Amino acid sequence: MPHRKKILLSDSNEALSMLLADSLRERGNFHVFHAKDEDETTKALHRHRPHVLLLDFLLPHKGGFHVMQHLREDGYKISTIFMTALPTHRVIEEAYRLSASFVLPKPFTARALVERIHDALRSDRP
């Protein structure tokens, strides 16, 4: 069996995260880790060294932008798919400014998510 890519899913919605993780394991054969806030995300990034970060805009406390800014300041390079239910021009522009690989507006299908993950894995842009 080929080596499974590691995905960190950072979203405070536990029910949605469980559904997404199950779908990613089945459809994409990924090893999925979950974090529900900024602190857990930071710890999981360093512990698991995932290939792709799925990051929700509305994380508790300071939010997804703060996580991205923190990673950028620390020089941490990872392909990031920024998930948002508020895909305004400002949100999308800021996500790309902070080095998001892709912005995925919610709601999205599992198929669309798997496609974006494969795109991120093929991309030269972390």
Task: Map each language-model feature to its residues.
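Alpha4 helix (beta4-alpha4-beta5 surface) of REC/receiver domains from two-component response regulators
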Residues: 66, 87-102
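Two-component/phosphorelay signaling modules centered on CheY-like receiver
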Residues: 14-33
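C-terminal output helix
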Residues: 108-118
